[in-house]
Amino acid sequence: MLATDSDPIVAIATASGRGGIGVVRISLGRAGEAAALALSDALCGARLTPRHASYVPFLDGAGEPLDRGIALYFPAPHSYTGEHVLELQGHGGPIVLQLVLQRCLDAGRAYGLRLAEPGEFTRRAFLNDKLDLAQAEAVADLIEASTEAAARSAGRSLDGAFSRDIHALVDDVIALRMLVEATLDFPEEEIDFLEAADARGKLAHIRERLAHVLGDARQGALLREGLSVVLAGQPNVGKSSLLNALAGAELAIVTPIAGTTRDKVAQTIQVEGIPLHIIDTAGLRETEDEVEKIGIARTWGEIERADVVLHLLDARSGLGPDDEAIAARFPAGVPVVRVLNKTDLTEAPASVARVGSGAERADLCEVRLSAKRGDGIDLLRGELLRIAGWQAGAESVYLARERHLIALRAAQAHVARAAEHADQNAQALDLFAEELRLAQEQLNSITGEFSSDDLLGVIFSRFCIGK
């Protein structure tokens, strides 16, 4: 904990701009109850009753009202931060909020009151055991949620669903570690603690439960991050038309002139609550046009960063030599969907089929559709969800971040290595115990029982000021 973590802090807790209500929040840190009572007198002209809403004037230094609104006092530890907290809820104009904020700073100068840093209120909630780290991150995820599914999943994380699963896993690992340690510490007793307690069965249960939690976390990470989908192919195969069809709006210019799209056009759409970041790119071809060359170079950059590439072809001509040359340059680790567009000109029905061959593209899928008429668009959306690994109706999903997935995969690897050492050889048992300890350490890092100050700084710096 840093020395500044106990400073009294203040910030505007509502979004910038104009609104019906604006909130100024004060958390008093080491200044405590005496400062809370003194500030309520100075700011509101009255002692506030704990956990009661009082309609009061917000006073300037001369005792004149700056605004009128609701004032609340939450004594420690029953507050968001676990400290004594004052909230002033007035009108949401930027000028009046700044005046109230400055008045708070002036009135609290004697107590060392300062402006809060981004995420500092939630950081204090974490440090004071009001939230664990996964719940604290869920606060930011709930604020930033771009879909209903993401918001509901963030709410489940904030409610502690993710944390409860992690704590249950940690408890199981600790219980198994105790058996291993007992066997190592009391060899003279000749008691097979591991065999008596079915240690291998417990380890299998941990592995099964860990795989389940990791699966849910992957779903949650997909809700949070979405999928980057790049439309690639030769000019004039209908990439812009497909973007418009997927988005349900005219976002890109569509003309019969090859090379119309010179730079990327991006749009985020929702499919079953999953954000799909669709990127239309410049057509891939040999050209002497310098501007078009720049656009083509950017296209390949987008392809390198993509989660999925939609390789568009003209359904009338199919996969030609130039298309094969383009496909050969696609990164091996990026899933590709071959999209044969313009089926309205061939009268072929919309369809989806697996056409993969070879090790690199064994799961290659081919979708036939008409972006112009909308035929087959739902088939393509379904294929994108399949590639993403989304399981429809995943009601228990909680929002997760990349660091959570990394920690869960690392824990899974340590538990797998522990299973390799699950015999009665003393040296193997030492390794068994160490792998379990490392797995526990990874799981604890998710909820913050084991976290570096650097990690905490990065997480909370991404919050808004008033949180």
Swiss-Prot record:
CDD domains: trmE, TrmE_N
Record-listed E.C. numbers: 3.6.-.-
Residues binding Mg(2+), per UniProt: 240, 261
Cofactor note: Binds 1 potassium ion per subunit.
Superkingdom of origin organism: Bacteria
Cofactor: K(+)
Gene Ontology terms for molecular function: GTP binding; GTPase activity; metal ion binding
PROSITE patterns linked: G_TRME
One GO term of the biological process aspect: tRNA wobble uridine modification
Domain TrmE-type G as annotated: residue spans: 226-389
Role description: Exhibits a very high intrinsic GTPase hydrolysis rate. Involved in the addition of a carboxymethylaminomethyl (cmnm) group at the wobble position (U34) of certain tRNAs, forming tRNA-cmnm(5)s(2)U34.
Subunit structure: Homodimer. Heterotetramer of two MnmE and two MnmG subunits.
Protein name in the entry: tRNA modification GTPase MnmE
